[in-house]
Amino acid sequence: MKKSMQWMLATILICGSCVFTSCTNDSKDNPSQPEQSEKTYSASTRELITLVNSHAQLKSLLEKAIAKGTEINPDRETNPAQTLSEYYDFVEWAAHAMPWTVINQPEGTDIFTRIDQSLNLFFFINDIPLEELDGQSLYNNSLQYFEPYRSWLKTFAKAWGAYLDSEDSWNQAYYDIVVKEDTFGISKGWYEDASNWKTFNQFFARKLKSPDVRPIASPEDNSVVVSPADACTQGVWQIDEEGYIVQDEDAGVQVKSKKFSSIAELLGPNSQYRDAFNGGTLTHSFLNVYDYHRYHFPMTGKVKEVNIIEADYAVGGTITWNPKTKKYDLFCDTPGWQSIETRGCVILETPDYGVVALLPIGMMPVTSINWAPEVKVGAEVTKGQELGHFLFGGSDFVILFQSGISFKLKPQLFSHQLMGEELGRLI
Protein backbone atom coordinates (compact mmCIF):
# COMPACT_ATOMS: atom_id res chain seq x y z
CA MET A 1 0.00 0.00 0.00
CA LYS A 2 1.61 3.28 -1.04
CA LYS A 3 1.74 6.20 1.33
CA SER A 4 -0.14 8.24 -1.23
CA MET A 5 -2.82 5.60 -1.48
CA GLN A 6 -5.16 5.05 -4.37
CA TRP A 7 -7.73 3.52 -2.18
CA MET A 8 -11.35 3.61 -2.73
CA LEU A 9 -13.65 2.24 -1.04
CA ALA A 10 -15.35 0.52 -2.14
CA THR A 11 -15.86 -2.56 -4.03
CA ILE A 12 -15.97 -4.99 -6.93
CA LEU A 13 -16.66 -6.59 -10.21
CA ILE A 14 -16.98 -5.56 -13.77
CA CYS A 15 -19.63 -5.44 -16.40
CA GLY A 16 -17.78 -5.22 -19.68
CA SER A 17 -20.90 -4.50 -21.66
CA CYS A 18 -21.92 -1.61 -19.37
CA VAL A 19 -20.13 1.42 -20.84
CA PHE A 20 -21.02 4.96 -19.88
CA THR A 21 -21.69 6.91 -23.07
CA SER A 22 -24.54 9.28 -22.24
CA CYS A 23 -22.24 12.04 -21.03
CA THR A 24 -19.25 11.59 -23.30
CA ASN A 25 -20.73 13.94 -25.88
CA ASP A 26 -22.89 17.01 -25.50
CA SER A 27 -26.27 16.82 -27.24
CA LYS A 28 -25.15 19.31 -29.87
CA ASP A 29 -22.45 16.83 -30.93
CA ASN A 30 -24.76 13.83 -30.80
CA PRO A 31 -28.07 14.40 -32.61
CA SER A 32 -29.48 11.11 -31.33
CA GLN A 33 -29.11 12.27 -27.73
CA PRO A 34 -32.22 14.13 -26.45
CA GLU A 35 -31.98 17.74 -25.35
CA GLN A 36 -31.93 18.34 -21.60
CA SER A 37 -35.56 19.45 -21.59
CA GLU A 38 -36.58 16.11 -23.13
CA LYS A 39 -34.64 13.96 -20.69
CA THR A 40 -36.16 12.22 -17.72
CA TYR A 41 -33.99 12.41 -14.64
CA SER A 42 -34.38 10.69 -11.29
CA ALA A 43 -35.19 12.61 -8.11
CA SER A 44 -31.60 13.19 -6.98
CA THR A 45 -30.56 14.71 -10.34
CA ARG A 46 -33.72 16.82 -10.53
CA GLU A 47 -32.92 18.17 -7.07
CA LEU A 48 -29.45 19.22 -8.24
CA ILE A 49 -30.84 20.93 -11.35
CA THR A 50 -33.36 22.83 -9.24
CA LEU A 51 -30.64 23.93 -6.81
CA VAL A 52 -28.35 25.11 -9.61
CA ASN A 53 -31.14 26.99 -11.40
CA SER A 54 -32.19 28.77 -8.21
CA HIS A 55 -28.74 29.50 -6.79
CA ALA A 56 -26.60 31.76 -8.98
CA GLN A 57 -23.43 31.35 -6.94
CA LEU A 58 -23.71 27.57 -6.93
CA LYS A 59 -24.17 27.53 -10.70
CA SER A 60 -21.14 29.76 -11.17
CA LEU A 61 -18.98 27.63 -8.87
CA LEU A 62 -20.06 24.34 -10.42
CA GLU A 63 -19.44 25.62 -13.95
CA LYS A 64 -16.03 26.90 -12.88
CA ALA A 65 -15.12 23.57 -11.25
CA ILE A 66 -16.15 21.71 -14.41
CA ALA A 67 -14.12 24.11 -16.58
CA LYS A 68 -11.04 23.79 -14.38
CA GLY A 69 -11.42 20.01 -14.40
CA THR A 70 -11.55 20.05 -18.20
CA GLU A 71 -8.40 22.18 -18.32
CA ILE A 72 -6.60 19.79 -15.96
CA ASN A 73 -7.81 16.65 -17.76
CA PRO A 74 -9.39 17.27 -21.19
CA ASP A 75 -9.58 13.54 -22.03
CA ARG A 76 -13.25 12.59 -22.33
CA GLU A 77 -12.59 8.93 -21.63
CA THR A 78 -11.44 9.74 -18.11
CA ASN A 79 -13.27 13.06 -17.61
CA PRO A 80 -16.55 12.82 -19.54
CA ALA A 81 -18.51 15.62 -17.81
CA GLN A 82 -17.15 18.79 -19.41
CA THR A 83 -20.29 20.93 -19.52
CA LEU A 84 -23.07 21.51 -17.01
CA SER A 85 -25.54 19.40 -18.98
CA GLU A 86 -22.98 16.61 -19.25
CA TYR A 87 -22.48 16.79 -15.51
CA TYR A 88 -26.21 16.25 -14.97
CA ASP A 89 -26.02 13.22 -17.26
CA PHE A 90 -22.97 11.97 -15.39
CA VAL A 91 -24.51 12.10 -11.90
CA GLU A 92 -27.70 10.53 -13.25
CA TRP A 93 -25.67 7.66 -14.65
CA ALA A 94 -23.54 7.27 -11.52
CA ALA A 95 -26.55 7.02 -9.19
CA HIS A 96 -27.62 3.83 -10.97
CA ALA A 97 -24.24 2.39 -11.94
CA MET A 98 -22.11 -0.34 -10.51
CA PRO A 99 -18.97 1.07 -8.86
CA TRP A 100 -16.64 -0.28 -11.54
CA THR A 101 -18.50 1.19 -14.53
CA VAL A 102 -18.46 4.91 -13.71
CA ILE A 103 -15.30 5.46 -15.76
CA ASN A 104 -14.14 3.89 -19.03
CA GLN A 105 -10.93 1.90 -18.62
CA PRO A 106 -8.78 -0.05 -21.09
CA GLU A 107 -9.75 -3.65 -21.74
CA GLY A 108 -8.19 -5.94 -19.16
CA THR A 109 -8.04 -3.37 -16.36
CA ASP A 110 -8.43 -5.10 -13.01
CA ILE A 111 -11.48 -4.52 -10.81
CA PHE A 112 -9.58 -2.68 -8.09
CA THR A 113 -8.35 -0.07 -10.55
CA ARG A 114 -11.79 0.27 -12.17
CA ILE A 115 -13.47 0.97 -8.84
CA ASP A 116 -10.65 3.18 -7.57
CA GLN A 117 -10.70 5.32 -10.70
CA SER A 118 -14.50 5.38 -10.94
CA LEU A 119 -14.90 6.77 -7.45
CA ASN A 120 -11.97 9.17 -7.74
CA LEU A 121 -13.50 10.48 -10.97
CA PHE A 122 -16.79 11.22 -9.23
CA PHE A 123 -15.05 13.42 -6.66
CA PHE A 124 -12.52 14.96 -9.05
CA ILE A 125 -14.86 17.85 -9.93
CA ASN A 126 -16.09 18.09 -6.35
CA ASP A 127 -12.53 18.48 -5.05
CA ILE A 128 -11.35 21.16 -7.51
CA PRO A 129 -9.93 24.14 -5.53
CA LEU A 130 -11.98 27.33 -5.98
CA GLU A 131 -10.49 30.60 -4.80
CA GLU A 132 -13.98 32.02 -4.27
CA LEU A 133 -14.30 29.65 -1.30
CA ASP A 134 -11.06 30.70 0.39
CA GLY A 135 -11.39 31.93 3.96
CA GLN A 136 -14.79 30.36 4.64
CA SER A 137 -13.58 27.89 7.33
CA LEU A 138 -14.32 24.92 5.08
CA TYR A 139 -12.19 21.78 5.22
CA ASN A 140 -10.85 22.92 1.88
CA ASN A 141 -11.96 25.39 -0.77
CA SER A 142 -13.90 22.93 -2.92
CA LEU A 143 -17.54 22.63 -3.89
CA GLN A 144 -18.22 19.50 -1.84
CA TYR A 145 -18.12 21.57 1.39
CA PHE A 146 -20.27 24.43 0.07
CA GLU A 147 -23.98 24.59 0.86
CA PRO A 148 -26.39 23.72 -0.66
CA TYR A 149 -24.23 21.40 -2.79
CA ARG A 150 -22.84 19.79 0.35
CA SER A 151 -26.32 18.65 1.38
CA TRP A 152 -27.11 17.49 -2.15
CA LEU A 153 -24.15 15.10 -2.02
CA LYS A 154 -25.96 13.30 0.82
CA THR A 155 -29.05 13.02 -1.39
CA PHE A 156 -26.93 11.55 -4.17
CA ALA A 157 -25.19 9.14 -1.79
CA LYS A 158 -28.49 7.83 -0.46
CA ALA A 159 -29.82 7.36 -4.01
CA TRP A 160 -26.75 5.39 -5.04
CA GLY A 161 -26.89 3.40 -1.81
CA ALA A 162 -30.54 2.52 -2.47
CA TYR A 163 -29.60 1.15 -5.88
CA LEU A 164 -26.82 -0.95 -4.37
CA ASP A 165 -29.33 -2.27 -1.82
CA SER A 166 -31.59 -3.43 -4.65
CA GLU A 167 -31.51 -6.82 -6.33
CA ASP A 168 -30.74 -5.07 -9.63
CA SER A 169 -27.21 -4.62 -8.30
CA TRP A 170 -26.29 -8.31 -8.09
CA ASN A 171 -26.39 -11.33 -10.37
CA GLN A 172 -24.51 -14.48 -11.26
CA ALA A 173 -22.26 -12.72 -13.76
CA TYR A 174 -21.02 -10.30 -11.09
CA TYR A 175 -20.40 -13.15 -8.69
CA ASP A 176 -18.43 -15.08 -11.31
CA ILE A 177 -16.11 -12.12 -11.85
CA VAL A 178 -15.52 -11.71 -8.12
CA VAL A 179 -14.51 -15.35 -7.81
CA LYS A 180 -12.13 -14.92 -10.73
CA GLU A 181 -10.56 -11.81 -9.12
CA ASP A 182 -8.64 -13.57 -6.35
CA THR A 183 -7.89 -10.37 -4.41
CA PHE A 184 -11.39 -10.53 -2.91
CA GLY A 185 -10.54 -13.80 -1.21
CA ILE A 186 -13.74 -15.56 -2.25
CA SER A 187 -11.82 -18.67 -3.26
CA LYS A 188 -10.08 -18.84 0.14
CA GLY A 189 -13.13 -20.28 1.84
CA TRP A 190 -13.44 -17.43 4.35
CA TYR A 191 -17.01 -16.33 3.74
CA GLU A 192 -20.61 -17.37 4.21
CA ASP A 193 -22.52 -19.14 1.45
CA ALA A 194 -22.76 -16.88 -1.60
CA SER A 195 -26.46 -17.68 -1.91
CA ASN A 196 -26.98 -15.20 0.95
CA TRP A 197 -25.98 -12.33 -1.33
CA LYS A 198 -28.98 -10.90 -3.15
CA THR A 199 -27.63 -7.35 -3.54
CA PHE A 200 -24.26 -5.69 -4.03
CA ASN A 201 -24.27 -4.39 -0.46
CA GLN A 202 -24.92 -7.86 0.91
CA PHE A 203 -21.81 -8.99 -0.92
CA PHE A 204 -19.88 -5.93 0.26
CA ALA A 205 -20.77 -6.59 3.92
CA ARG A 206 -20.30 -10.34 3.56
CA LYS A 207 -19.96 -12.35 6.76
CA LEU A 208 -17.28 -14.84 7.71
CA LYS A 209 -18.37 -18.47 7.60
CA SER A 210 -16.77 -19.12 10.99
CA PRO A 211 -14.73 -17.24 13.63
CA ASP A 212 -12.00 -19.82 12.97
CA VAL A 213 -11.02 -18.12 9.69
CA ARG A 214 -9.93 -15.03 11.65
CA PRO A 215 -8.18 -16.31 14.80
CA ILE A 216 -7.75 -13.68 17.52
CA ALA A 217 -4.20 -13.01 18.74
CA SER A 218 -3.75 -13.50 22.50
CA PRO A 219 -7.47 -13.38 23.30
CA GLU A 220 -6.88 -13.31 27.08
CA ASP A 221 -4.18 -10.61 27.00
CA ASN A 222 -5.63 -7.10 26.65
CA SER A 223 -2.18 -5.56 26.20
CA VAL A 224 -2.25 -7.13 22.73
CA VAL A 225 -4.45 -4.92 20.54
CA VAL A 226 -5.72 -6.73 17.47
CA SER A 227 -6.58 -5.29 14.09
CA PRO A 228 -10.30 -4.39 14.14
CA ALA A 229 -10.65 -5.16 10.43
CA ASP A 230 -8.89 -6.45 7.35
CA ALA A 231 -6.98 -3.24 6.68
CA CYS A 232 -3.68 -1.48 5.98
CA THR A 233 -2.00 0.24 8.92
CA GLN A 234 -1.40 3.96 8.44
CA GLY A 235 0.71 4.88 11.44
CA VAL A 236 0.62 6.27 14.98
CA TRP A 237 0.19 9.93 15.95
CA GLN A 238 0.50 11.71 19.26
CA ILE A 239 -2.29 13.90 20.63
CA ASP A 240 -1.13 17.05 22.40
CA GLU A 241 -2.31 18.18 25.83
CA GLU A 242 -4.93 20.43 24.24
CA GLY A 243 -6.43 17.55 22.30
CA TYR A 244 -5.02 18.14 18.81
CA ILE A 245 -3.29 15.63 16.54
CA VAL A 246 0.42 16.39 16.33
CA GLN A 247 1.15 16.64 12.62
CA ASP A 248 4.43 15.95 10.86
CA GLU A 249 5.43 19.21 9.18
CA ASP A 250 7.25 17.24 6.49
CA ALA A 251 4.27 15.06 5.61
CA GLY A 252 2.41 17.48 3.37
CA VAL A 253 -0.21 18.17 6.01
CA GLN A 254 -3.74 18.25 4.64
CA VAL A 255 -5.41 19.64 7.75
CA LYS A 256 -6.07 23.31 7.02
CA SER A 257 -7.37 24.28 10.47
CA LYS A 258 -6.88 23.09 14.04
CA LYS A 259 -10.61 22.40 14.03
CA PHE A 260 -10.03 19.43 11.75
CA SER A 261 -7.22 17.96 13.89
CA SER A 262 -9.26 18.24 17.07
CA ILE A 263 -9.99 14.99 18.89
CA ALA A 264 -13.04 16.62 20.50
CA GLU A 265 -14.41 17.32 17.00
CA LEU A 266 -13.62 13.76 15.95
CA LEU A 267 -15.54 12.30 18.90
CA GLY A 268 -18.55 14.48 18.14
CA PRO A 269 -20.69 16.93 20.12
CA ASN A 270 -22.56 14.31 22.15
CA SER A 271 -19.59 12.45 23.59
CA GLN A 272 -18.85 12.72 27.30
CA TYR A 273 -15.22 11.82 26.54
CA ARG A 274 -14.23 14.73 24.30
CA ASP A 275 -11.26 15.64 26.52
CA ALA A 276 -10.43 12.14 27.75
CA PHE A 277 -7.73 11.55 25.13
CA ASN A 278 -5.70 14.76 25.53
CA GLY A 279 -2.04 13.75 25.58
CA GLY A 280 -2.89 10.32 24.20
CA THR A 281 -2.30 8.41 20.97
CA LEU A 282 -4.15 7.88 17.67
CA THR A 283 -3.72 5.05 15.19
CA HIS A 284 -5.77 4.32 12.10
CA SER A 285 -6.09 1.66 9.42
CA PHE A 286 -7.57 1.84 5.94
CA LEU A 287 -9.90 -0.81 4.49
CA ASN A 288 -9.41 -1.39 0.79
CA VAL A 289 -11.85 -2.26 -2.00
CA TYR A 290 -11.43 -5.99 -1.67
CA ASP A 291 -11.37 -6.28 2.13
CA TYR A 292 -13.79 -7.94 4.53
CA HIS A 293 -15.90 -4.94 5.61
CA ARG A 294 -17.05 -5.96 9.07
CA TYR A 295 -15.19 -4.47 12.01
CA HIS A 296 -14.58 -6.05 15.41
CA PHE A 297 -13.56 -5.06 18.94
CA PRO A 298 -9.75 -4.87 19.19
CA MET A 299 -9.84 -5.27 22.98
CA THR A 300 -12.06 -6.65 25.73
CA GLY A 301 -14.06 -4.25 27.89
CA LYS A 302 -17.37 -2.61 28.72
CA VAL A 303 -19.23 -0.31 26.32
CA LYS A 304 -19.67 3.13 27.89
CA GLU A 305 -20.96 5.14 24.94
CA VAL A 306 -22.31 4.52 21.43
CA ASN A 307 -22.77 7.35 18.92
CA ILE A 308 -23.10 7.96 15.20
CA ILE A 309 -21.89 11.40 14.14
CA GLU A 310 -23.63 12.53 10.96
CA ALA A 311 -21.31 14.72 8.91
CA ASP A 312 -20.07 15.08 5.35
CA TYR A 313 -20.21 12.71 2.40
CA ALA A 314 -16.97 14.14 1.06
CA VAL A 315 -13.70 12.73 -0.20
CA GLY A 316 -11.76 13.80 2.91
CA GLY A 317 -8.33 13.67 1.30
CA THR A 318 -7.18 15.32 -1.91
CA ILE A 319 -7.74 14.01 -5.44
CA THR A 320 -5.36 14.97 -8.24
CA TRP A 321 -5.04 13.95 -11.89
CA ASN A 322 -1.69 12.43 -12.84
CA PRO A 323 -1.12 13.08 -16.57
CA LYS A 324 1.83 10.67 -16.69
CA THR A 325 -0.08 7.64 -15.42
CA LYS A 326 -3.42 8.94 -16.73
CA LYS A 327 -4.99 8.12 -13.39
CA TYR A 328 -6.57 9.93 -10.46
CA ASP A 329 -4.63 9.77 -7.19
CA LEU A 330 -6.14 10.12 -3.74
CA PHE A 331 -3.93 11.31 -0.87
CA CYS A 332 -5.48 10.54 2.53
CA ASP A 333 -2.78 9.11 4.79
CA THR A 334 -2.45 12.20 7.04
CA PRO A 335 -5.09 12.13 9.81
CA GLY A 336 -7.60 14.91 10.41
CA TRP A 337 -10.01 14.34 7.53
CA GLN A 338 -11.85 11.75 9.63
CA SER A 339 -13.44 14.58 11.65
CA ILE A 340 -15.45 15.73 8.61
CA GLU A 341 -16.84 12.32 7.63
CA THR A 342 -19.93 10.54 8.93
CA ARG A 343 -18.57 8.15 11.53
CA GLY A 344 -19.36 5.97 14.51
CA CYS A 345 -17.84 6.15 17.98
CA VAL A 346 -17.83 3.54 20.72
CA ILE A 347 -16.10 4.26 24.02
CA LEU A 348 -14.76 1.07 25.55
CA GLU A 349 -13.76 0.90 29.22
CA THR A 350 -10.94 -1.61 29.75
CA PRO A 351 -9.80 -3.12 33.06
CA ASP A 352 -6.16 -2.05 32.81
CA TYR A 353 -5.79 0.54 30.04
CA GLY A 354 -8.42 3.18 30.72
CA VAL A 355 -10.99 4.07 28.11
CA VAL A 356 -10.37 3.45 24.42
CA ALA A 357 -12.25 5.14 21.56
CA LEU A 358 -13.18 3.03 18.54
CA LEU A 359 -14.24 4.97 15.45
CA PRO A 360 -15.33 3.32 12.20
CA ILE A 361 -15.14 6.08 9.57
CA GLY A 362 -17.53 5.97 6.63
CA MET A 363 -16.00 7.47 3.52
CA MET A 364 -17.37 8.69 0.23
CA PRO A 365 -19.37 8.18 -1.76
CA VAL A 366 -22.02 6.19 0.14
CA THR A 367 -21.20 6.55 3.82
CA SER A 368 -22.77 3.88 6.04
CA ILE A 369 -22.08 2.96 9.68
CA ASN A 370 -23.97 0.00 11.14
CA TRP A 371 -23.65 -1.45 14.65
CA ALA A 372 -24.02 -5.11 15.57
CA PRO A 373 -27.24 -5.67 17.60
CA GLU A 374 -25.28 -6.46 20.79
CA VAL A 375 -23.44 -3.13 20.79
CA LYS A 376 -25.25 -1.20 23.51
CA VAL A 377 -24.18 0.89 26.48
CA GLY A 378 -23.35 -1.42 29.38
CA ALA A 379 -22.57 -4.45 27.21
CA GLU A 380 -19.55 -6.54 28.19
CA VAL A 381 -17.67 -7.39 25.00
CA THR A 382 -14.67 -9.52 24.15
CA LYS A 383 -11.75 -9.03 21.83
CA GLY A 384 -12.71 -10.14 18.32
CA GLN A 385 -16.47 -9.79 18.86
CA GLU A 386 -18.26 -8.12 15.95
CA LEU A 387 -18.72 -4.37 16.40
CA GLY A 388 -20.49 -3.54 13.13
CA HIS A 389 -20.12 -3.25 9.37
CA PHE A 390 -19.74 -0.82 6.51
CA LEU A 391 -21.90 -0.80 3.42
CA PHE A 392 -20.58 0.50 0.11
CA GLY A 393 -18.00 3.25 0.32
CA GLY A 394 -14.49 3.86 1.49
CA SER A 395 -13.70 2.85 5.05
CA ASP A 396 -11.22 3.69 7.78
CA PHE A 397 -10.90 2.72 11.45
CA VAL A 398 -9.45 4.97 14.16
CA ILE A 399 -8.41 3.90 17.67
CA LEU A 400 -7.61 6.39 20.45
CA PHE A 401 -5.68 5.62 23.64
CA GLN A 402 -5.42 7.83 26.71
CA SER A 403 -2.42 9.70 28.07
CA GLY A 404 0.06 7.50 29.91
CA ILE A 405 -0.67 4.47 27.72
CA SER A 406 2.13 3.70 25.28
CA PHE A 407 1.08 1.96 22.06
CA LYS A 408 3.67 0.31 19.81
CA LEU A 409 2.58 -0.68 16.31
CA LYS A 410 3.70 -4.19 15.37
CA PRO A 411 3.32 -4.46 11.56
CA GLN A 412 5.34 -2.49 9.07
CA LEU A 413 3.72 0.79 8.06
CA PHE A 414 1.12 0.41 5.27
CA SER A 415 1.19 -3.37 5.51
CA HIS A 416 -2.05 -5.33 5.24
CA GLN A 417 -3.47 -7.22 8.21
CA LEU A 418 -6.38 -9.55 8.70
CA MET A 419 -8.88 -8.85 11.45
CA GLY A 420 -7.68 -10.44 14.69
CA GLU A 421 -3.97 -10.27 13.93
CA GLU A 422 -1.80 -8.32 16.36
CA LEU A 423 -1.92 -4.60 15.59
CA GLY A 424 0.29 -3.54 18.48
CA ARG A 425 0.96 -3.65 22.20
CA LEU A 426 0.12 -1.43 25.13
CA ILE A 427 2.64 -0.66 27.84
Regions found by a protein language model. Give the residues of each.
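Bacterial Sec-dependent N-terminal signal peptides
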Residues: 17-37
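Bacterial N-terminal signal peptides that target proteins for export
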Residues: 1-9
